[in-house]
Curated annotation (Swiss-Prot):
One of its GO terms (molecular function) is ribonucleoside binding. Pfam families: RNA_pol_Rpb2_1, RNA_pol_Rpb2_2, RNA_pol_Rpb2_3, RNA_pol_Rpb2_45, RNA_pol_Rpb2_6, RNA_pol_Rpb2_7. It is an enzyme of class 2 (transferase). The keyword ATP-binding does not apply. It catalyses: RNA(n) + a ribonucleoside 5'-triphosphate = RNA(n+1) + diphosphate. Keywords: DNA-directed RNA polymerase, Nucleotidyltransferase, Transcription, Transferase. Belongs to the RNA polymerase beta chain family. This is DNA-directed RNA polymerase subunit beta. The RNAP catalytic core consists of 2 alpha, 1 beta, 1 beta' and 1 omega subunit. When a sigma factor is associated with the core the holoenzyme is formed, which can initiate transcription.
C-alpha cells in the first residue's frame, strides 16, 4: 500500500510497488561523457590520422606530438562570457616536430591552435555570450546491410549495401535472371564476378572453387565477358573512369585508393565492429547441418562431424579457431559459408593480452603470421602493437569483400538474415564529441593542404613549424560548427525541464542525416527496439514527428554510439530475478525473453506466477517462468523524463500524452513555484540533473546565508566554499532566472545536496505550475471549445504571475560622417521625456518605462547640406554647436513596458572587446510582471490545453459546501472524446491528498490503482466517487448534479497574450510593393487576403473595398493625403493609383502589349513612373528629409524592410558601416529606422 519516501527535503507518499533495483544514470551524461571522450581520445585520433605530413619529395616531415588544453589561461569565466558576449573557451596548444630528412635537423615548437570552446558543467557551450546545446544525431551505422525486394513473379531478389563511415559504397543487387550485379560508388552495375576477379581470382574455376557451386554465381559468370584478372581490372577501370586510357597498373592503384587506403576509406571502430559481427561464421552456421567434417587448422582435431548439427556454442568455437569457410547442407544442397576471418585474440594467444587494449576481433591470417614467426611473449606483444593497423584494419579488406559476396549467395538458402534499417542496432548516435571530432578533422585536413604548399614554397633551412601551420582553417571549421550547424541549437531555457530535454534530444536531421521531405513513414514510426532506449511518446507534432526523439530515462550510450538499456539478469534454473544489472544494446536484446518490471516477485526474487508475460521482439508472449532471460529494472524505463512526469500516464491516450510531454517544456516559471501534490517521483532527479540548482561541492556546515550567497565550511579541511546565487538574470527565452536559498545557517549539508531553488523548482523538485482547486462544470458557455473560466483570486493573489526580462541594446558606431554619440543632448526632445535619463544619456535603474520612452539617447551626424545665409550666420555665431545631428535614440518598442532592472555599458576605453566600428555598447534590461489575463494559454499535464475566456469575480464562482469557491472551471466534454482519463484520476487523488496534507508520488505504469484512490478519498472523509454538490455563486442555489471537484496541477504556457497582441495605424511599408509589412516584429498590418476581398465583394461593399485596396495599402500619395485629411478633420479625398496596378501594367508591357489607362471620360491618365515624381506634386515632405520640416506628422516609406528584395535598397547605408563577418541583418534593420511616425509619438 502507500508508503513514505524521502525526496530531498520533502516526504512523498508513494504508491509505487516496484522497488528500483538500480539508480537512474546522470541525465545529462550523454553530453558530458561524449565531450570528455573527445578531449581524452577524440583529438588524439584526429592527430594520429593526419600524422605525419610530408612534402612531395618526402624530405620534410611535420608531426603533431602532443596537445593540451590550457585550462589555466581561460580568458573569461562562464558568467563573464555571458555578460561580455564572449565564447567560453580554452587555448589549444599543440607541440609540433619538424624533421628535415636531408640534414637530419629536428625542430620542435609549441603552436597555438586557436581557442577551443569548453563545455560547462551543465552540458552546454557558451558561444558569443549565448548558451547553446549540441543535439546528438541518429544516423545509419556503417556496416553491411542486406535487403530483399519481391519481383512480379513473387520471387525474392536479395540486395546488399556496404556502407563505410566515409569512402566508396559497394552495392550488390540481383535481377530476375538470378545474375548478381555490383555497383561501385553509385556507378553503372557490373556482374559481381568481375569484382571477384579483380580481387585476385582469375579463372572461372578458381571462382567456383572458392565460392562453391551456386547457380546464381554460375549465371553471373556466364553474363561476365571477362575471363582473367587483368580483364576484370580493366573492365572496372573503364566503368569508373570512362574516357581515360585503361592500364592494369592504373586499375590496381584505382581500386587500392578506393577501398584499401585508410585516408580515403574509413570504416571507423563501429564499422569494423558491425562488419565483424555480420560477416562472422557463428551467427550464420548456428543450427545448420555440416556437409563435411570441420577440422581445427591449428590442432587438426575434428570439431564437427559430417551431417552433425552445429550448436550455437560450437559455432563460436569454429569462428574463433580461425576457420575461413564451412560447407553446410540445406535441403541436400551444399552451400559454402565464407567468413571475413576475424577471431577473438584471447582464444588464440596463450598469454594475457589485456594490457594491449584490444577490444575488437583481429584478422586471423595476420595474427597467425606473427605467432608463427615469434615465440616469446614480449616480442609477440611488441609485434602486435606494431601491426595493429593490419590486425584491426580501419579500411575494408579483400576478406571482407569475399565474405559479403558469400553472405549474398547464402541468403536464398536461409543462411544469415536480412536487416531492418530502422532497428536501433543499425542506427547509432553521433554525440557532441564525435560531431566535434568530424569538424576538427575537416579543419585539420584543410590545414594539411596549406602545410604541404608552404613546404614546397619556403626556404627549407630557415623553416619552423610555426611558419608552416596556419590555424585559420581549424578555427573556422570549429566556429562554423558551433555558430551555424543544424545540430548546434540555441538552448531552450524556458524552464529546467526544457533545458534537460534539449540536452537529451536525438535528431535524425542534420548533415549526413535524413531530410524532412525524404523521410518516409517507417523511419518515423515507433520500433520495438526503441523499448527502454528512445521514448515512444515524446516527439514534436508536425513535419518533424518521429525524426526528433528523446532519450529514455535509463538509457545510456556505449562506446560505439549504440543506445543501451539496463535489465535484471534472471537465474533461469530457479526462475529467480537476481540483483545483477547489465546493459544491453538493441541487437543483443533481440535473442531474449524479457519480463515486465511489474511482474510479481516474492521477497527472495522468485517469480510468483508459473506463467510470465514477456516481450520477444515485437510480440508479447506468455511463457513458463523458467524460460525468462531478463527483466525490466523499472516501470518508467521506456519513457523519457518529460513523459515520466505525467501521473497516470497509463490512463491517457498516446496522442494526448505526447501533447502533455511537449507542453510541460513550455511552462513559464512562476513567481512562487509550487511542487505538484500528485507527482511521479522523478521531479527531484530531473531538477537536480538539469543543472539549474546550486549543489554542495563538499560536505560541511552552512556558516552564512543571504539572498546572494551561501557559504559552507568544509568538513575535510575547514576551508570555506562560496556559492554565488543568480538574481533576476534573463534566460534565452526571456524568462527570469532567480535562485533562493533553501538551507539555514548552522545546517549540516552532505556532498551534492541542493542548497538553493532555481526557476520552477520547489525544495529541489521541479515545479512547473500550481495546484489548483477546480471542477468539471460548464458555466454559461464560457468553457466552450476547451476555454477555461478562472477566478479573480488567481490574478489578485499572483498565483499565475510570472516575470519576463527583455534585453535591448544600442551601439554607437563610426559612420562616414563622423562617430555617433551617446548623449543626453538630443534635438527636439522635451525635458519631460528626459526626466529619467542621467547625464550620460542612459536611463536610470528602477525607472518605469512605457512604449516610446527613450532608453539611451544617441545622435548620429547628418549629411552636410548647402547652407543658407541665416544658417551660415548662426554657424558663425555659435561655432561647431549647430552641426546637424539626427536623433537615433533607442526607444522602448511598441507594446512593451516595464521597469529597468539593469544597465550594462561597454566601451573601448574600458578594454571591452567590441565589434569593429563600434565605440560604445549599452544594454538595458526591462522586467515585466505579467499577471494571468484573458487569452493566455494554460494546460494540465495530460494534453488538456485551453485559453482563458473570462476572469470571474470570486463571489460569482461556483462554491463548495464549506464555502470555498473554485479557482478554475473546466469543460467536462474535454475528457471523453480525448481519452485522457489520467486527469480525472489526478483530480480525485489530489482532492484526497490535499485534505490529508500529503504530497504523493504515483510513478508511471506503477501508480495508484482505482481502489487505492477510493480508499484515499474515504480516508479524507469524501465521497468515494469523488463528486461534491456545488452551489452557484450568483444565486446560492445548488447545481442540479454533483460535480467532480479536486486539485489539478495546471501550467501557464509560454504563449502569452501580451506577446501576441498587436495593432498598427501607420508604419513601415515594403520597398518594392509599397504595401505594409506583415507581423508584429515588423510593426506590420493585417493582411486582407483574397478570400476577405471575396467577402466584401459578396456584400457589395464597394467603398470599403476600394479603400482597403488603395489608401490602406499601396496608393502612395493617397495614403499621405488621407492621413492629412484625418488630422485636419477634412473629408477623405479620392484614392489614387495603387502601386500594384502599376506593376500589373509593367507586366503587360513586358508581354509587348501597349497599355493605356483611361478615365470615365475616355481620357488617358498619365501614370507617374516613380514615386519621387508623385511626391514632387505633393506639398508635404514624405521622406522626412530634414531640409524643410513637414506641416503634419506624415508617414512614409521607411527603409525598414525584412525581406529586402531590392538589392540597392540598403546598400548605401551599408557603406557607412564597416563590414565585419559577425554582422547580422537584425542589427542592420534597427540602423535603418527612419520612421517619422514613431519619432513623433
Amino acid at each position: 500500500m502507500v508508503h513514505p519516501v524521502q525526496v530531498g527535503k520533502r516526504t512523498r507518499m508513494s504508491f509505487g510497488k516496484v522497488k528500483d533495483v538500480t539508480e537512474m544514470p546522470n541525465l545529462i551524461e550523454v553530453q558530458l561523457d561524449s565531450y570528455q571522450w573527445f578531449l581524452r581520445e577524440g583529438l588524439h585520433e584526429v592527430f594520429d590520422d593526419i600524422n605525419p605530413i610530408t612534402n612531395f619529395t618526402g624530405n620534410l616531415v611535420l608531426e603533431f606530438v602532443d596537445y593540451k588544453l590550457d585550462m589555466d589561461n581561460i580568458k573569461y569565466s562562464v558568467e563573464e562570457c555571458k555578460e561580455r558576449d564572449a565564447t567560453y573557451a580554452a587555448p589549444l596548444k599543440v607541440s609540433v616536430r619538424l624533421q628535415n630528412n636531408e640534414t637530419g635537423e629536428i625542430k620542435e615548437q609549441e603552436v597555438f591552435m586557436g581557442d577551443f570552446p569548453l563545455m560547462t558543467d551543465q552540458g552546454t557551450f557558451i558561444i558569443n555570450g549565448a548558451e547553446r546545446v549540441i543535439v546528438s544525431q541518429l544516423v545509419r551505422s556503417p556496416g553491411v546491410y542486406y535487403n530483399y525486394s519481391i519481383d512480379k513473379t513473387g520471387k525474392k531478389l536479395y540486395s546488399a549495401t556496404v556502407i563505410p563511415n566515409r569512402g566508396a559504397w559497394l552495392e550488390y543487387e540481383t535481377d530476375s535472371n538470378d545474375i548478381i550485379y555490383v555497383r561501385i560508388d553509385k556507378t553503372r552495375k557490373l556482374p559481381i564476378t568481375i569484382l571477384a576477379r579483380a580481387m585476385g581470382f582469375g579463372s572461372d574455376q578458381e571462382l567456383l572453387d572458392f565460392f562453391g557451386e551456386d547457380e546464381r554465381f554460375r549465371a553471373s559468370i556466364e553474363k561476365d565477358n571477362t575471363k582473367t584478372r587483368e580483364e576484370g581490372l580493366l573492365e572496372i577501370y573503364k566503368r569508373l573512369r570512362p574516357g581515360e586510357p585503361p592500364t592494369v597498373d592504373s586499375a590496381i592503384s584505382l581500386i587500392d585508393s578506393l577501398f584499401f587506403d585508410a585516408k580515403r576509406y574509413d570504416l571507423s571502430r563501429v564499422g569494423r565492429y558491425k562488419f565483424n559481427k555480420k560477416l562472422a561464421l557463428n551467427l550464420r552456421i548456428a543450427n545448420q547441418i555440416a556437409a563435411m567434417d570441420v577440422i581445427n587448422p591449428s590442432t587438426g582435431e575434428i570439431m564437427v562431424e559430417k551431417g552433425q548439427k552445429i550448436s550455437r556454442l560450437l559455432s563460436e568455437d569454429i569462428q574463433n579457431a580461425g576457420i575461413k569457410s564451412v560447407d553446410i547442407l540445406v535441403d541436400d544442397k551444399l552451400v559454402r559459408v565464407i567468413s571475413n576471418n576475424f577471431v577473438d585474440i584471447t582464444k588464440q594467444v596463450p598469454f594475457d593480452v589485456s594490457d594491449l587494449q584490444i577490444k575488437e576481433l583481429v584478422h586471423y591470417p595476420t595474427l597467425k603470421e606473427i605467432l608463427d614467426n615469434y615465440s616469446d611473449e614480449a616480442t609477440i606483444k611488441e609485434e602486435i602493437k606494431k601491426n595493429l593497423s593490419r590486425l584491426i584494419p580501419k579500411h575494408i579488406i579483400k576478406d571482407d569483400i569475399f565474405a559479403t559476396i558469400s553472405y549474398e549467395l547464402g541468403l536464398p538458402y536461409g543462411i544469415g538474415y536480412v536487416d531492418d534499417i530502422d532497428h536501433l542496432g543499425n542506427r547509432r548516435l553521433r554525440s557532441v564529441g564525435e560531431l566535434l571530432q568530424n569538424q576538427f578533422r575537416i579543419g585539420l585536413s584543410r590545414m594539411e593542404r596549406v602545410v604541404k604548399e608552404r613546404m614546397t614554397i619556403q626556404d627549407q633551412e630557415s623553416i619552423t613549424p610555426q611558419m608552416l601551420i596556419n590555424i585559420r582553417p581549424v578555427a573556422a571549421a570549429i566556429k562554423e560548427f558551433f555558430g551555424s550547424s543544424q545540430l548546434s541549437q540555441f538552448m531552450d531555457q524556458t524552464n529546467p525541464l526544457s533545458e534537460l530535454t534539449h540536452k537529451r534530444r536525438l535528431s535524425a536531421l542534420g548533415p549526413g542525416g535524413l531530410s524532412r521531405e525524404r523521410a518516409g513513414f517507417e523511419v518515423r514510426d515507433v520500433h520495438h527496439s526503441h523499448y527502454g532506449r528512445m521514448c515512444p511518446i515524446e516527439t514534436p507534432e508536425g513535419p518533424n514527428i518521429g525524426l526528433i526523439n528523446s532519450l529514455a530515462t535509463f538509457a545510456r550510450v556505449n562506446e560505439y554510439g549504440f543506445i543501451e538499456t539496463p535489465y535484471r539478469i534472471i537465474d533461469k534454473e530457479n526462475a529467480r530475478a537476481t540483483e545483477e544489472i547489465r546493459y544491453f544494446t538493441a541487437d543483443e536484446e533481440d535473442q531474449c525473453l524479457i519480463a515486465q518490471a511489474k511482474e510479481p516477485l516474492d521477497e527472495n526474487g522468485y517469480f510468483v506466477d508459473k506463467k510470465v508475460t514477456v516481450r520477444y521482439l515485437e510480440d508479447v508472449l506468455v511463457v513458463p517462468a523458467t524460460d525468462v532471460d531478463l527483466m525490466d529494472v523499472s516501470a518508467r524505463q521506456i519513457v523519457s523524463v518529460a513523459t515520466a512526469m505525467i501521473p497516470f500516464l497509463e490512463n491517457d491516450d498516446a496522442s494526448r500524452a505526447l501533447m502533455g510531454s511537449n507542453m510541460q517544456r513550455q511552462a513559464v516559471p512562476l513567481l512562487k513555484p509550487q511542487a505538484p501534490i500528485v507527482g511521479t517521483g522523478i521531479e527531484f532527479k530531473a531538477a537536480v540533473d538539469s543543472g539549474v540548482l546550486p549543489k554542495a561541492k563538499n560536505a560541511g556546515v552552512v556558516t552564512f546565508v543571504s539572498a546572494n550567497e551561501i557559504r559552507v565550511k568544509r568538513d575535510s579541511d575547514g576551508g570555506t566554499d562560496n556559492y554565488r546565487l543568480l538574481k533576476f538574470k534573463r534566460s534565452n527565452q526571456s524568462s527570469c532566472i532567480n535562485q533562493r536559498p533553501i538551507v539555514n545557517k548552522g545546517e549540516i549539508v552532505f556532498k551534492n545536496q541542493v542548497l538553493a531553488d532555481g526557476p520552477s523548482t520547489d525544495l529541489g523538485e521541479i515545479a512547473l505550475g500550481k495546484n489548483i482547486r477546480m471542477g468539471f462544470i460548464t458555466w454559461e458557455g464560457y468553457n466552450y471549445e476547451d476555454a477555461m473560466l478562472i477566478s479573480e483570486e488567481l490574478v489578485r493573489e499572483d498565483v499565475f504571475t510570472s516575470m519576463h526580462i527583455e534585453e535591448y541594446e544600442c551601439e554607437a558606431r563610426d559612420t562616414k560622417l563622423g562617430p555617433e554619440e551617446i548623449t543626453r543632448d538630443i534635438p527636439n526632445v522635451s525635458e519631460d521625456a528626459l526626466k529619467d535619463i542621467d547625464d550620460r544619456g542612459i536611463i536610470r535603474i528602477g525607472a518605469e518605462v512605457r512604449s516610446g520612452d527613450i532608453l539611451v539617447g544617441k545622435v548620429t551626424p547628418k549629411g552636410e547640406t548647402e547652407l543658407t545665409a541665416e544658417e551660415r550666420l548662426l554657424r558663425a555665431i555659435f561655432g561647431e554647436k549647430a552641426r546637424e545631428v539626427r536623433d537615433t535614440s533607442l526607444r522602448v518598442p511598441h507594446g512593451e513596458a516595464g521597469i529597468i532592472v539593469d544597465i550594462k555599458v561597454f566601451t573601448r576605453e574600458n578594454g571591452d572587446e567590441l565589434n569593429p566600428g563600434v565605440n560604445e555598447l549599452v544594454r538595458c534590461y526591462i522586467v515585466q510582471k505579467r499577471k494571468i489575463s484573458v487569452g493566455d494559454k494554460m494546460a494540465g499535464r495530460h494534453g488538456n490545453k485551453g485559453v482563458i475566456s473570462r476572469i470571474l469575480p470570486e463571489e460569482d464562482m461556483p462554491f463548495l459546501p464549506d464555502g470555498r469557491p473554485l479557482q478554475i472551471c473546466l469543460n467536462p466534454l474535454g475528457v471523453p472524446s480525448r481519452m485522457n482519463i489520467g486527469q480525472v484520476l489526478e483530480v480525485h487523488l489530489g482532492w484526497a491528498a490535499s485534505k490529508l496534507g500529503w504530497h504523493i508520488s504515483t510513478p508511471v505504469f506503477d501508480g495508484a490503482t482505482e481502489n487505492e484512490i477510493e480508499a484515499c478519498l474515504e480516508k479524507a472523509g469524501y465521497n468515494a466517487n469523488g463528486k461534491t454538490v456545488l452551489y452557484d455563486g450568483r444565486t446560492g442555489e445548488p447545481f442540479d448534479n454533483p460535480v467532480t471537484v479536486g486539485i489539478m496541477y495546471i501550467l501557464k504556457l509560454a504563449h502569452l497574450v501580451d506577446d501576441k497582441i498587436h495593432a498598427r495605424s501607420t508604419g513601415p511599408y515594403s520597398l518594392v510593393t509599397q504595401q505594409p509589412l506583415g507581423g508584429k516584429a515588423q510593426f506590420g498590418g493585417q493582411r486582407f487576403g483574397e478570400m476577405e476581398v471575396w467577402a466584401l465583394e459578396a456584400y457589395g461593399a464597394a467603398h470599403t473595398l476600394q479603400e482597403i485596396l488603395t489608401v490602406k495599402s499601396d496608393d502612395v500619395v493617397g495614403r499621405v493625403k488621407t492621413y492629412e485629411a484625418i488630422v485636419k478633420g477634412e473629408n477623405i479625398p479620392e484614392p489614387g493609383v495603387p502601386e500594384s496596378f502599376k506593376v500589373l501594367i509593367k507586366e503587360l508591357q513586358a508581354l509587348c502589349l501597349d497599355v493605356k489607362v483611361l478615365n470615365e471620360n475616355h481620357q488617358e491618365v498619365s501614370l507617374k513612373e516613380y514615386t519621387d515624381d508623385e511626391i514632387a506634386d505633393l506639398e508635404v515632405n514624405i521622406e522626412g528629409s530634414e531640409e524643410s520640416t513637414p506641416v503634419v506628422p506624415v508617414v512614409e516609406s521607411n527603409i525598414e524592410e525584412v525581406e529586402v528584395e531590392a538589392e540597392d535598397g540598403y546598400r548605401e547605408d551599408l557603406d557607412e558601416i564597416e563590414y565585419d563577418e559577425n554582422f547580422e541583418i537584425e542589427t542592420l534593420e534597427t540602423d535603418l529606422e527612419l520612421d517619422d511616425f514613431n519619432d513623433e509619438h
